[in-house]
Structure formats: C-alpha cells, structure tokens
Amino acid sequence: MLASKLDPFLKRFEELNSLLSSSDIINDISKMTTLSKEQKNLEPIVLKAKEYLKTLDNIEENKALLNDPELGELAKEELKTLEELKPKLEEEIKILLLPKDPNDERNIFLEIRAGAGGDEASLFVGDLVKAYARYAENRGYKLEIVSSSEGSVGGFKEIIMLVKGTGAYSRLKYEGGTHRVQRVPQTESQGRVHTSAITVAVMPEVDDIEIEINPNDLKVDVMRSSGHGGQSVNTTDSAVRITHIPTGIVVVNQDGKSQHKNKESAMKVLKARLYEMQESERLAKESEARKSQVGSGDRSERIRTYNFPQNRISDHRINLTLYRLDAIMQDGLFDEIIEPLITHHQAQALQEQNL
C-alpha cells in the first residue's frame, strides 16, 4: 500500500525538525548544512504525502456520512471530488519516490562538435549554439563559452559552453548524442538535400573534492592563441593545452585573456570529462534495460534528426515527430522535446521500481 511507503519519509522529516532545533546541531555548521539539505530534499514528498493521507481520511469520513439524511448528498458530492483527486496524488507521489539522479541540480558543460558533413556540420553547430542560448535564457540559466574553434565558413568546428542554473543537468542531459541535420546548403545550386551530423556531450560540472587529479599525471603546454584561419590573435603564450596522461584526454583552451584563466577553465573541463568517464563506466556495469530507458546519452547514439525542408524535428528515442523545427530553433523551445523525454523516462523508471 502506498501509504505505508510514505511513513519512513514522514518520520525522518519530523526527526530532522527536532535535530535542527537542538543546540548541538545549531552550533555545528557542517551538520546543520547537511541536515538542512536533507530536509529540503524531503519536503516535496512530505507535503504531498500529508495531502494524500488527509485525502484518504476525508474519503473515509464522507463514506460514513453517505446515509446521513442531512449530510448524505453533500458527502456524496465531496466524495466524488476526493475520489478523482486520489489517483492524481498517487501518480505525483510515485514520481517523487523515484530515485533522484545525483547530478540533476548541477551546472553542465555542453560540448558540441561538428562530425560528418564538413562545413555544413560546422554551420549547424553554430545554429544549435544559438538555439541552446535562447533555451538557456528562457529557463533563466546563464551560458558562457569556455572554448571554441570556428569553422572555415562560419559556425564552429567545436565549442564548449558552461550552462549555469538549478536543474540544468536534469533537462539538458537528454541532449547527449548524435544530432543529424538534413538541409539544402546555400552553395547547393541543384537544391539537393545534404545530410550532416554533429555530436553533443553533456557533462556535469564537478568540484575538486569529487575528482582528484595527480599533478604528475598532467602534461601542460602553453602556446600562442590562434584565431580564425589560424592567425595569431595576441603576442603572449596564453593558450593552454592539458593532457591527462593516464587516459589520453586532451583539453585546449585559448578563449580567456590570460594563461591563468585558460588553465583554470581547461582544468574544469578535464575534471568534467574524467567524471563523465567514471559515470559511463558505472552505468556500463548496470543492467542494459536501465541504461536504455531514454537512451544511453552516448555521443555515438543518433538521437535526433532536424529536417529543414520538411520543417520536421524527430527524436528517435521516443518516436516523437514535430513539424515546427523553425520555431523550436528560433525560440529555443527544446522543452517541447525534453518534457516528453522526461515523461517517458519516468514511466520506464516507475515500471522498473514496481511503483
């Protein structure tokens, strides 16, 4: 019974209330912070649980009044409303009971690379960057470019952006994978549709405590920054290339104004990549069914097609097709795709948890 599953949450919440008012905890900032965070995380399920249990009590009270000559009709109407509310609350509670992704509230690094298709792929990276920037603005996220390499005719060969905002990972994690684009290039005189592809990697930002890097495992090179076409953009050795020797991961950053700033940014990206590698290894050890709930997020997995001649965008993980590609790209309306993906993910998780 669902009500019995809620009891531990209610008891723990009351326990936390008592602990947070005790002098021992008040005088211990570290414990106070930890327990306050736990209480905040429990609050949504506790509030919904109390509403649900109150609804169950009200249902029983109104059932007892059905044969009352004065209150029977009123109880019947009230009971109808409560019986409709009960399953809605149950579904909301089941969603809240699902295991939380520990990365969901983090900022993210969004790494986009041009793949097959040459210049067309680079141009689409540029278009997608603009669309993601609008999406970030819509949701109140802050977006900053960490590093970039421009394409020869525009757009980007590759770009790394930091997206800051509560829940950024919880939504944009669904963007990881291969994005295929079909459109007629401006240089195409015959009107033929060309197909190109880009890859998106979504990496949660991590702190120093979570990822420790031995300085002896790093090779740090400094060089002149180069701009569009390879020309030097300044006369100082400000660009930084960091190689993590054990894994072979290489990060280059030249967008900052100083060597120190570029090294700091490159280290953040390196930590995110190492964390992503660890997470991928962990996921690989779990069951394939769980890994493929909405798609693995592997950058080699083709997740979406953007067909410009048909104004069509298709997400292959959930067989979703929308004929409003122009609006989605122009206004950054990715929630029209992300929301169905979240719903699908939750349905799969509910089935797995037998809720």
UniProtKB/Swiss-Prot annotation:
One GO cellular component term of this record is: cytoplasm
Keyword Cytoplasm assigned: yes
- UniProt-listed PROSITE patterns: RF_PROK_I (PS00745)
Fetch the InterPro entries from UniProt. Answer: PCRF, Pep_chain_release_fac_I, Pep_chain_release_fac_I_sf, Prokaryotic/Mito_RF, RF-1
Per the UniProt record, which residue ranges are transmembrane?
A: none
Q: Which domain of life is it from?
A: Bacteria
* Cellular compartment(s): Cytoplasm
**Molecular function terms from GO:** translation release factor activity, codon specific
Q: Where is this region: Disordered?
A: 280-303
Family per record: Belongs to the prokaryotic/mitochondrial release factor family.
Name this polypeptide is given: Peptide chain release factor 1
